[in-house]
UniProtKB/Swiss-Prot annotation:
Organism classification: Eukaryota, Viridiplantae, Streptophyta, Embryophyta, Tracheophyta
Gene Ontology biological process: gene silencing by siRNA-directed DNA methylation; regulatory ncRNA-mediated gene silencing
Protein name, entry field: Protein DEFECTIVE IN MERISTEM SILENCING 3
Gene Ontology CC, one term: RNA polymerase V complex
MF GO annotations: protein homodimerization activity
Length: 420
């Protein structure tokens, strides 16, 4: 190709190699490069704005649901409050009619005699704790309950309930026995310990408690006795019969295998006791009354039947004992009380006071309960209103943040003008 021996010379031209950093700066300063950079950054910013807007939108939806929940709660509470207002008005009308009744509200002589009869039955047991307490009450009246020793004493079992039917009263008294009928009922354990003290050797200190009180009135407690502590009893925690002023327990009636109620079933003993309205609520610090505590523990679900034959026929349905008006007694499942027995001479009183008086007392108790529930509902309404207002405020702040996010996203997505 080339002549042999001919020397070829190459003239080298130096290359102009520029600094990469300078090239980058130069490229970025150019209009085209600047436009490309801005477009790439805009895409990333738009994606972030979209993610942020979706997050804010989700937060707004959750906060809106929270506001609706508070509004639903307020609607329910206000409807409950309106129902209570109507019930209070109806009860006020009922009480007005009772108050204008020609039958006096004060206790009549029959009721007084009934109380004296029960007190006399207890006083016959001279050497009992119940006898001492009843004698102190007879001698000192209302002042007896102000003694430090007796402040926590609710009373004697026999005097804390009444039974409409004399025969049933005797049957229930026989079921419980004299010891339980004369038991001393106390509100709490401190009241129980106040009844009796002991020396260093574990012997009863006759100079303290009920023994000292008995000595002061010429009585000596020679028999052992039961003291029932209400706050230590396991109370009934189920429902009560609706709109029942005596707050009877809503117990399931016994059913035979065919689904029918046994013939002759009259009810549960615990619900056949009439209780003074003052003892239906808040006898214990937990708000329970005597029916849920004392009488539920004495009778549990004791069933009452018309005859012994009815009771025996219902054996498959009896779980906590049963009694019949003709004297039949089943203590527990499988334990029958047979043979002749001496009748307990301390019975529940028969309520012979004016029904008008009883109804008025029950209405007063119901009115007190309704007003208490209304106050609690009003407090719940105020609390729910505060929570709703707080939720609405937070929703407004979040909405402002969402609007700002949308505005920024709109600015980012505007088309850029490419220079010509």
């Amino acid at each position: 190709m080339y002549p042999t021996g001919q020397q070829i010379s190459f003239q080298t031209t130096p290359l102009n190699v520029q600094d990469p950093t300078r090239m980058m700066n130069l490229d970025q300063s150019s209009p085209v490069a600047r436009n490309e950079t801005q477009n790439g950054g805009g895409i990333a910013h738009a994606e972030f704005a979209m993610f942020n807007s979706k997050r804010l939108e989700s937060d707004l939806e959750a906060m809106g649901n929270k506001i609706k929940q508070h509004e639903d709660n307020l609607k329910f509470l206000k409807s409950q409050k309106n129902k209570m207002d109507e019930a209070i008005v109806d009860l006020q009308v009922h009480m007005s009619k009772l108050n204008s009744s020609p039958t006096p509200r004060s206790e009549n002589s029959d009721n007084s005699l009934q109380g004296e009869d029960i007190n006399a039955q207890i006083l016959r047991h001279e050497n009992s704790a119940a006898g001492v307490l009843s004698l102190v009450e007879t001698l000192h009246g209302a002042q007896a309950s102000q003694l430090m020793l007796t402040k926590g004493v609710v009373g004697v079992v026999a005097k804390l309930g009444k039974v409409n039917d004399e025969n049933l009263s005797q049957i229930l008294s026989n079921y419980l026995g004299t010891r339980s009928m004369l038991a001393v009922v106390c509100r709490n354990y401190e009241s129980v310990t106040a009844l009796e003290a002991y020396d260093n050797h574990g012997n009863i200190d006759i100079n303290a408690g009920l023994h000292c009180l008995g000595s002061s009135i010429g009585r000596e407690i020679g028999d052992s006795f039961d003291a029932i502590c209400l706050e230590n009893l396991r109370p009934y925690v189920g429902q009560h019969i609706a709109d029942d002023l005596q707050r009877r327990l809503d117990l399931l009636k016994p059913k035979l295998p065919n689904g029918e109620c046994p013939p002759g079933f009259l009810g549960f003993a615990v619900n056949m006791i009439q209780i003074d309205p003052a003892y239906l609520l808040c006898v214990t610090s937990y708000g329970y009354g005597l029916r849920e505590t004392l009488f539920y523990n004495l009778f549990s679900r004791l069933q009452v039947y018309k005859t012994r034959a009815d009771m025996i026929s219902a054996l498959p349905c009896i779980s906590d004992g049963a009694v019949s008006l003709d004297g039949g007694i089943i203590r527990k499942t499988g334990i029958f009380n047979l043979g002749n027995r001496d009748e307990v001479n301390v019975r529940f009183a028969k309520p012979t006071a004016s029904r008008t008086m009883d109804n008025y007392s029950e209405a007063e108790k119901k009115m007190k309960e309704l007003k208490w529930k209304k106050e609690k509902t009003l407090e719940d309404i105020k609390r729910e209103q505060v929570l709703r207002e707080h939720a609405v405020f937070n929703f407004g702040k979040k909405k402002e943040e969402f609007v700002r996010c949308l505005a920024q996203s709109s600015c980012t997505n505007q088309p850029m003008n490419t220079p010509r």
